[in-house]
Amino acid sequence: MTAVSPTAEGVTLGSQDLHVHTTMSDGEVPLEEVVRLAAERGVKVGIADHVSTRNPQRFVATDAQLRRYLERIEAEPVFVSAEFCWCDPLSTALPPEIMDRFDYRIGSNHGFSLPDDGWASPWWSDLPDPWNARPHELMDHMVANLCDLVTTMPIEIVAHSTFMPSGLMEIERDVHAWWTEEREDRFVEAVVASGVALEISNRYRLPHDRLLRKAKQAGARFTLGSDGHRAAQVARLDWAVETALRVGIGEGDMFVPERA
C-alpha cells in the first residue's frame, strides 16, 4: 500500500491518486488492471489518459475515441478525467456536453510557445540555438506559458508544472537558479488567481519545497498524482505524501473531486 498519513482533520493524505494512465493512451496497464491495483493498494484513482491530437497514434485523439474512452471509465469505480496538452487547442474546442462528463480535467506543459512562433519542449536534453546561449530567457518564456496555462485552460489541475528541460539542469543543477524567487512568485500568483490545483508529482518528484511552501501560504490547492504509466507506479504516492507533510500541506489544502 502507498503511504497514507493521518492529518489533523482526522482523514488521510494519499488516499487519492488523481493522475493515472492506461493502455487507452501511452500507459502500459489496462484499465481493469489499474482498477484492481488501486483496490489492492487502498487508493482511489482518477484515470487521466492523454486526450490530444498531437500524437494520434498513442493518444485519445478523435471524437469517437473520446466518447468510447469516457464510456469505459464511467463504468468503473474511478474518477473520470483526462490530461490535456497546453500545446494543443483541443481542450477549448470540445463541446460542453463532453467536458461536463469529466469529474475534473488536467492540463500539462508538454510544449510551450516561443516568440518566433516555434515551440520548445520541457524534455529538451540539449538546448538548440539560440536558446543554448539564452537559457534564462528560455526559462522566462516557459514560466510565462505556465501562467497562461493555468489562467486560460479549462482545467482543475496542473500536472508536473515545474518540470523543465534537462538541458537547463546540465548548465546548473540547483533548481533555484532557474526557479528564482521572482519566477516562483509569478507562477504561484497565477495558480492562486486561477483556482487551479497544483499537482505534487510522485513520478517527477516536483514541485520543489520552496515553491510548495509559497503556494500553501498563498492559499493554493493541491493534488497528489503518481502519473502512473506502469504497474509499479499506479497508486504509489510515497514521495508525494512525504513532501506534502514536510512542507505543511494537509488534507484541508487538497482539491477533492466528486463524480459528475
PLM regions with names:
Residues 1-88, 97, 164-178, 186-187, ...:
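An N-terminally biased module of ancient metal coordination in phosphate/nucleic-acid-related enzymes
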Residues 2-18, 31, 174-260:
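Charged catalytic cores and adjacent phosphate/nucleic-acid-binding surfaces used
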Residues 36, 95-100, 215-218:
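Short, surface-exposed basic-aromatic patches at helix termini and helix-loop junctions that form
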Residues 46-48, 106, 159, 199:
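Conserved beta-strand positions in the central sheet of alpha/beta enzyme cores
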Residues 50-51, 110, 163, 203:
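Flexible loop residues that form catalytic
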Residues 59-193, 245:
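Extended substrate/RNA-proximal surfaces in nucleic-acid metabolism proteins
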